Amino acid sequence: MKFTFIKSLLIAFAVSLFSSFQLMATDMHGVMCGGEIRPADQAVVDQFMSDNPGVNVTMEAVPWGTCQDKVINLAIAGDPVSFSYVGSRTLKGLAENGHIVAVDIPDSQKKMYQPGILDTVSYKGNIWGYPHAFSTKALFMNCGLIEQAGLACEGPQSWDELYSMAESVKNNTGAAGIGLTGKDFDNTMHQFLNYLYSNGGQVIDPATNAITLDSPNTVETLEFYAKLANVSQEGPLAWERSQLTELFNDEQIAMYINGPWGAGQHKEEL
C-alpha cells in the first residue's frame, strides 16, 4: 500500500485538576511536563495567588520522559497533584480510576477550539482537561546527503518512496537513511504513533472507545517500522527522540520526524 507524506496532527497536551478536595487547600502543587516553567504559566499562577490571598501555588517542572509516570504514580499513591500539564492520552485512564475531576468549559470557550479538539479530552460525556497544544509532525530532510546519494531532495509521497530514499542514502553515503528511536516506551510510542496516524490508524475508536491496536493499519505500521531499522542509525534501541536532532545536526542521519520546534534546533547550513 502507498501512503501520503508522513505528517501527523496530534493533540499533545491537556491540563486537568487532580483531586477535588485539593481545590480548597491553601497549598497547591502543580507538575508541568516539559522540563521548564514558562513565563506565561508563572504569570497565570501569580495572578491566581493574587486573586486568592492565603493560597500558595508551587509548580514543578519535570522532563517528559518521566513526568507522566510521576503524576500517575502520585495519584495512585493517594497524594495527587492539584493540577498538571500532561498528555491528553493519560486522561481516560485517570478518569476511569477516579484520579481527576471533570471540568466545565463554558460554551463560549468551547467555540474557541477547532472541531474535534475537545474530543481528545472527552470521555463518557465529560471533559477531563483543557486542550492546550496542537502539534504538527514533519519529516526533516538533509538535502546535501540526499543529493549526494544521487536523488532529488523532494519529500517522499509514500512509505515506499521514503524507504527507497533512506536506503539510497545508506548505500551511497556514510550516513544512515533515517533516524529511529526505541530506547523506552515513551520514545518508541511517540515515534510509532507518527507512522500509525499517517497510515490511517488509531489507538481508540472515538465513537465506541474500543481499543483498535489490533487493526490491519497497526500491523502494517509495525512491519514498516521494523523494516526502517534496516536503513536507520545503528542500534535504534539505544536512542531517544531528542538525540535524533543531534544526529541530524552531525549529518549522521539524512531524515527524521520531529515537531516544528526542530527547525530552530538545526544548524543554519541544514
Outline where the language-model segments fall.
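Conserved N-terminal structural module of periplasmic/extracytoplasmic solute-binding proteins
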Residues: 21-93, 107-111, 237, 262
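Bacterial N-terminal signal peptides
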Residues: 8-20
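Hinge/lid segment of periplasmic solute-binding proteins
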Residues: 88-138, 160-163, 188-191
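Short, solvent-exposed loop/beta-turn-alpha elements that line the ligand-binding surface or hinge
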Residues: 101-115, 179-183, 199-220, 267-270
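Short helix-initiation/N-cap motifs at beta->coil->alpha
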Residues: 61-70, 89, 157-163, 236-250
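Glycine-centered hinge/linker elements that transmit conformational signals in sensory
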Residues: 165-168, 207-237, 267
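Extracytoplasmic/periplasmic solute-binding protein
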Residues: 128-132, 137, 161-210, 217, ...
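Alpha-to-beta junction loops
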Residues: 75-86, 174-176, 250-258
